[in-house]
Structures are given as structure tokens and as C-alpha cells.
Amino acid sequence: MGEIEQKPTPASRLGAPENSGISTLERGQKPPPTPSGKLMTVKIQMLDDTQEAFEVPQRAPGKVLFDAVCNHLNLVEGDYFGLEFPDHRKIVVWLDLLKPIVKQIRRPKHVVVKFVVKFFPPDHTQLQEELTRYLFALQVKQDLAQGRLTCNDTSAALLISHIVQSEIGDFDEALDREHLAKNKYVPQQDALEDRIMEFHHSHVGQTPAESDFQLLEVARRLEMYGIRLHPAKDREGTKINLAVANTGILVFQGFTKINAFNWAKVRKLSFKRKRFLIKLRPDVNSSYQDTLEFLMAGRDFCKSFWKICVEHHAFFRLFEEPKPKPKPVLFSRGSSFRFSGRTQKQVLDYVKEGGHKKVQFERKHSKIHSTRSLVSQPTAPNSEVPKQSPQSASLTFGEGTESPGGQSCQQAKETKACTLELGPHQSPALPKSPPGSKAADGTTVVPPEEEEEEEGGKDGIRPSNPQPPQPSTGSLTGSPHLSELSINSQGGAAPANVTLSPNLSPDNKQASPLISPLLNDQACPRTDDEEEGRRKRFPTDKAYYIAKEVSTTERTYLKDLEVIASWFQSTVSKEDSMPEALKSLIFPNFEPLHKFHTNFLKEIEQRLALWEGRSNAHVRGDYQRIGDVMLKNIQGMKHLAAHLWKHSEALEALETSIKGSRRLEHFCRDFELQKVCYLPLNTFLLRPLHRLMHYKHVLERLCKHHPPNHADFRDCRAALAEITEMVAQLHGTMIKMENFQKLHELKKDLIGIDNLVTPGREFIRLGSLSKLSGKGLQQRMFFLFNDVLLYTSRGLTASNQFKVHGQLPLYGMTIEESEEEWGVPHCLTLRGQRQSIIVAASSRSEMEKWMEDIQMAIDLAEKSNGPTPELLASSPPDNKSPDEATAADQESEDDLSASRTSLERQAPHRGNTMVHVCWHRSTSVSMVDFSIAVENQLSGNLLRKFKNSNGWQKLWVVFTNFCLFFYKSHQDSHPLASLPLLGYSLTIPSESENIHKDYVFKLHFKSHVYYFRAESEYTFERWMEVIRSATSSASRAHILSHKESHLY
């Protein structure tokens, strides 16, 4: 990582000398070997709000990281502290000292681990070290500011006065007022200012160490000292909060303690799913054993609280760490979690028995010398205690400090790197296990009376991680021509990834998502030198590559026209399933377009051939332009406007005919399953309208690129004016037809619903949310329209469709955040006139998107004529087969866990629709996103490379509908594989990946990594632009303004 500046650590700011680690091993013991392998960097936020970066081996247990932090702080009594972080489910948990770090902190770059107090002893005099008491004082200060430590005004003022005394010394009215103005210790501090100064005046002569001691003396008497509330409900459904302390388990209503269960009374702690159970010991006069039951938000919240209780019981009640449970011979039951570390008694004995010496040091904002105990260690002959000025020696709260190099720290938020390496052949130096441990590795187990009563299956669907990673390969799509579909689940700051590739096989072998035999490394071999030489013959002018984009996308557009004009027409002619009136409306309006654009493509390719220098015409420069070709053909398109106007009518007529004819419905469904129909059929009917918009964007780029005096500028500007006029005329039709097409597409994914497509209804957003029900959080697909919100589940139906469970009219609905109320991250409460539901999103950003769109839809509904008509069908629709209806009716809450493994069934329904992708990735897509996707279509040749391969493979790639479709060449009639991009990360390879090529971008999720090479800087930027539109979504305000400036 290079040289790291030596900035003061929290311990050095207290004046503690640096040492090589405090040995806590028994005499004669050796430290356990440090795991070798790749290092990972973990950011730790200290109690003074600074951040430190630690490098530890990925496979090392959590104890390695925790000991590294304690060693960095020179902290002897580290057992009172812990490391907490939000896991992949967004639940704040403690770092398990026995499990590998990489299995707990899955995305260390995006997680900040907090070093905080974990165990609060009943008496602060049990804390032997001044540094320990100082860190406890910082924790009290933090809890005050965050509202965790609630108390009356007098207690708050007294606490703050001790903090001020330790920070700035004796009372001085002017200095006090200035300091209190700059530092806010509680939210309503202004009203307490006079009382704070009154108390501070009485602390004259009190040293910082004495101030910390007095601060803890006051704090420990408060009811909420060291209390962390966990939302729950009792058997009657009353909302309460559970907490654990050194004395036992506490029950709060709000911030008022209403009950307590002392450890001496507790016989057993367990949990089943989301039920937390406390078995009490029988009274002296009774043999009856009472069992108390509390309901928490979900299984993960319940297990997290159970672990905290186990650790508190072991730390405060046991004399030594519990012995490991013997491993079962055949079957195991319960959790493998166990307490690891020293108990409080062991910590007290160790500090009392250890050899210590007094060392002088300087404290923050004070020149008073104090003493601190350190384990006796040999010191270098010339070593000195570091001396620091009050400005640079203090823990920084709101002011910068200067490092030795002269760089300013950003208000105590700087990140320091602590590389734990002693030398080129040494493992990181870390503190070792404490004496009193029965084993060198510090392994412990939970006492038998605290075992977990966990049922065999892990049920329940968690909002931020709906499916564990599956090593097998499987098909999400019902289309046999799609060789692959890889999916991952998002999370805010994000979340765990899931791979769902073709044909879930029973052998559970990991396969690459792109498994088509024509897409492997052996196919289409090309050496890098050959490719480089070929690319260098191309012109370097950006206008050439813009013109080439017209050519490549025109090829794809022509193929899309052939789907209707050739393939669909040929299939229809073989079967008498379509009315003649419908045939005459569709095909005569596509054939002229196909003929025109075939000639248009030939002209563009001829011009590019001349531009590339395959004749001597390019010497004169007459053919190094494209504007004249664009102007001529766009003027020709205006004569085809009558056919373009008919496409909306054809789409409506087709859907009307399908609704009235079951035979035509089955015919169209069968055609959609053919390889050539890689998108929903009705999407191809709108392609001509979409293409006009693409011409407009290309001409805008050309006009922006050319200077006004360029030979091609005038033609490009004239062509842009012509196409802009056509787009403006079709703008209203486009908006209407996109919504109409999307409603009919959604209708095919839903069962149990009537009249979804009605005049005036507009689709707004679809996506996956978790609904809180009697069985916990259950995954549901939600569909938001401008008048109603539907929620569905995916059951074990033969068609892979989603069954509608309920509808919530938006008229009169309210929406509010309820994360604190239910203790579920990213939680919302939707209150309708007839029904209220609680849902949770997979991330904060997802929650905000839903809140924004639902509120907008509510506002639209309020302006309408009133409540929406009933949508739910009382019986399955007539056009569904009896088998489908029966299977749909049998779907229940209990089917949901099984529905996730039902992907291996081949269904007659398309399985690669955006509804299914959003279901598996726990994300959402809005109608605005679909509109943006229409504008961001691209195709062309790319070189593809797998993570572990050497050669590059040339593929023809089409990006449309949030997905990459792969072809062996542009002449292929259908794609060989597809890759939906929702949830993927788009980056540029780092130097460590050894790509060493220009214009390379990287797509990755989980262990799947793909590298793609473009042929020029322009094409590289264009691929990055369009793919980024699918892997990230902008805010609604930004997108609406974008659409207004690009009317179509």
C-alpha cells in the first residue's frame, strides 16, 4: 500500500508508548499461526470518530482483526469492547471472533466496522485501566448525542459538565460558552447551557481522569446506561423492546423498564423462527416452569438478539470461558455459535496479577500529567514517551489536526492505514490470547442451558438477501434458445449476489453463465496481434465511429423488422389462426419499411467502405461524411409516415384479437418461444417508432462533433431538423403505446386478475418487496399503477406466472416510514381505506424509489374521479387452462420457499421477462426506466474475455431491454445467450488484473467476471454509457427533465 504516514493513534494521543503487542498468553504457550493468503482491508471507526484501516488475511477469524485493533490502541482490557457492523441483511451484528472475517464482512470496501463498548460492567471501578475508562467515557458521550442514553435535564447537564471539564479544563465562562457553541453533546443543549456551566464551576481542579471517573459514576446510575433496545411484541401483540444487561434480560415499553429477568431465574434461552423464548426456573413453592414468548421482526433479528444474550451471560456469570461442546456423531441440532474470549472475572484477575509500571502521558486539552498502567516490557534504551501539544495530542471533535507531513485531517474522519506486517517473511504481529484460556485458540461454547432450539429448515425470506448463493447452474428463462441468464440480488449499499444460470442440474457443479459451445474460448480464436493490426487500419475520426454506430444498429433494426415481416408472417401463413383484417393491418405496413431500410443499410455500408480507404476516393475526402446519406434517407422516411402511424393501431388490434381468441393467444405464445423472437412479440411492433429516436440522437452527436464550417455539418443539421419534426409528431403516440404495450406484457405475467388494461390506467413501477405477515417477511412482487397497487407471489404454477394476492386502491392511501416501529430495515407502512400492509425494501435506495413513486401515484389518484374499480378476479380468467387455475389456487404462504427452487421446470411462458429478473434480484424497475432503456440501445462487435482465460473472443453483441444478447456474428438470426444487467457492477479493470489493453470495461457480480474490449474510444464510451443506464437508475426528477429535453 506504499508508505503510510505515522499519524497519532488514540493511544498515542493519550501519551502511551508504542509496543509490539501485549502478550496475553499463558507462560510457555505460542500464538496460533496467522492464516496466510490474500489480505483484505477493513475500515474501523473508533470511539473518537476517526477511522483506521487494518489489513488482515481474508480467511483469518474475527479474533485476528479484533486483536489487531486492541493492539493498535495498546488496550489491555479489550474484552469489554467489540466490533459491530451491518451485515448483508442490514442487521447490525457483532463480529464473531471464531468465524472467518470474509464470511462475515462480505463487502469490506463498503462497510465501516465500529469499535464500541459491548459489555457494560455494573461498577465502573472494575475498570482498572485509565484508557479503558476514557473509552467508556467516549461511549457515554456518543450515546448522549445519539439519544440512546436518555435522562432528565439535570443528569444530562451534569454529564456534559464532566465531559467539558475533561476536554478544556477548569471553568472559564467565556471559554465555556465558546466551547458549548461549537460542540453539541445533546440535541436540546441550548436550554441546558447555564446549568452545565453551573456544574462545571464546581469541578475546579478535577483532572481529566477524575472527570472520566465521575462521568461514569453518574452514567451507571441511569436506567438506560449501556442499554441497546431490540423491538419486539409480546403474546398479546403489544409493542415492547427487549434488552440485555449484566444482570439479565430487560423488558421496556418505550424507554421505561417494565420487567426484568435475572440470570439466576433464567433456565434456558432459545428461539424458533422469529419467536424468542425464555424458560424460567420454577419457584421454590412450585414445580411449574414458565416459558415466556416474544415475537421479533424476523428470524435473523431473533437469532442476533439470542447471540447477544448468550455472550452477556457467559461474560458476566461464568468464571471462565465455557468448554466446547463435543461434536455430534451423526446429527447436529442447534446453532454452532459459542462465546469466545475471556470472562469478566478472567479480565479482572489478569489485570490485577500482571506486572505494571507507571508511565506519564498528556491528555486532550490539558497539560496535567497522569499515570497509566502498562504490561512490563523491555524498552529501547533511547525510547521516549511521545509528547504532544494540546492541539495535536487530542482526540479531534470538530477540528483538524496536522500530521507530521503537514497534511490536514478532515475533522476526525481521516482514514489511517495500519498494515500489520513486520517484515517480508513475517506474519502480522497481533495481540495474543489471554491467560486463563483453556486452549490456545480461545475456543469456547455456549453453556448447554442456552442452546438454540432451531427447526431443521431455514425458512423465511429476508428482504436484502432473498436467496443464498447457489453453486449449481439453472435456467431462469422458459425460452430454450437462451443459453444463459445470470442474476444477482442487490443492496444499497447492497447486498449478496445470486447466480441463476441455465438448467439447474442435480450435480451442483458451478458453470460459467456463458456456456454455449459457440461462446467458449475455443470458438472464434483470434490473436491479440492480429486484432491490433486490423484495428489500426480504421480511421481515427470520431465521426467515422458515429457513422459506424448507425450501421451496426441498423443491422439490428433490420433483424427486428424481419421478425414481423418475415418470420411472423411466414408462421401465420401456415396456420389459419389470425383474422384477415389483422393480417392486412400488420404485414403491409412492415414490408415497405423492411425494403426501405435494407437499401438504407447498403448505402451506409458502401459509404463506410469508402471511408475506411478501400478505394482511392477517400483521398479527396468526398466520402468521409455521412450527413448526406442520412438527409436523403430521412426525407425518404417521411413518405413512409403513413405506415408508422398504423403501428399503434396494429398493436391495439392484435391485443384485442388475442383477448377474444384463445387460439390466437396460444399461437402468439408459441411464436414468442421461438429462438428468433428474443423479446416479447408486441415489442417488435413498436421498433419503428423507437428507431426514429435513435436517428435523432446520432445526428445530435454528429452536429455537436462537427464545427459549423465542416463540409458535413449542413447536411447533418438539416437531417436533424427533419427527424426532430417526425419525432415530435409521433411523441404522443409513443407515450401512449409504450404504456399500452407494458400493460399487456404485465398481464401475461399475472394470474387471478381481470381488466388490468383499462383506459386511463398507467403503469408506474414493478419490483420485489418483502411483506410483513403472520409468518414473517415474505417476498412479494408489487405492481404500482396510477390508481392501484397490486401485490403478488410466485407460486408453483405450470406457467411460472405470479398470482395476485391483493390490491390496495391508492385513493385515500397514506405512506410512512416505519423502520423504528417494526425494527425492520427499509420498512414502509401503507395505510389504505380498507387495508394496511407493512413492506420492506432490499435497500435504502429501493425504499426511496418506492416512496417517491407511490406518493406520486397517490397524488394522481386524489386528482382522479375517485376509487378504482375492483381488479381481482373472483375466479381464474376464462382463457387460462383448468390445470393452471388449480395450481394457482393451491399456492399459499408455505409454497414460497419451494418456489425459489422451481426454476428447473420448462414452462410455456417466457421466463426472462423483467418481472422475473426483478423477483430474483430483489430490485425494481419503473416505467421511466423503460423509457430510458428505449433510448439506450446499441449493437456492434466486442471482444470478450473470461476472468481466468487468456484469449479474446469476438462476438456480436446487442444491448436492449436492460440485457446483453450475444451472437456469433451479426448474420445470426437469433442470440446464443443473454445476460440481464440489473444489479451488475460496471467498472474499468485495475492494473492488478493484468489486462494491459485499451478500451476495456468490466462487468461483474459475485464470482462471475467478464471483460469486454471496444475498438475505439468512442465505442468504448458509448458501451459504458448505455450499460450504465441499466446498472444504475437516476432520480425521477432527473429522468423527467431528461425526457422533456429529448421529446420523441
From Swiss-Prot:
Its main location: membrane. One of its GO terms (biological process) is Rac protein signal transduction. Gene3D superfamilies: 1.20.80.10, Dbl homology (DH) domain, Phosphatidylinositol 3-kinase Catalytic Subunit, Chain A, domain 1, Pleckstrin-homology domain (PH domain)/Phosphotyrosine-binding domain (PTB). The gene is Farp1. This is FERM, ARHGEF and pleckstrin domain-containing protein 1. It is a peripheral membrane protein. It is found in: Cell membrane; Synapse; Synapse, Synaptosome; Cytoplasm, Cytosol. It comes from Mus musculus (Mouse). The lineage of its organism: Eukaryota, Metazoa, Chordata, Craniata, Vertebrata. Residues 40-320 form the FERM domain. Functions as a guanine nucleotide exchange factor for RAC1. May play a role in semaphorin signaling. Plays a role in the assembly and disassembly of dendritic filopodia, the formation of dendritic spines, regulation of dendrite length and ultimately the formation of synapses. SUPFAM superfamilies: DBL homology domain (DH-domain), PH domain-like, Second domain of FERM, Ubiquitin-like. Signal peptide: none annotated. The modification Phosphoserine is found at residues 20, 23, 340, 373, 389, 403, 427, 433, 437, 512, 516, 836, 875, 881, 892, 899, 902. Residues 542-733 form the DH domain. The modification Phosphothreonine is found at residues 24, 886. Intramolecular interaction between the DH domain and the PH domains can stabilize the protein in an autoinhibited conformation. GO terms for cellular component: cytoplasmic side of plasma membrane; cytoskeleton; cytosol; dendrite; dendritic spine; extrinsic component of postsynaptic membrane; filopodium; glutamatergic synapse. GO terms for molecular function: cytoskeletal protein binding; guanyl-nucleotide exchange factor activity; small GTPase binding. It holds the Pfam family FERM_C.
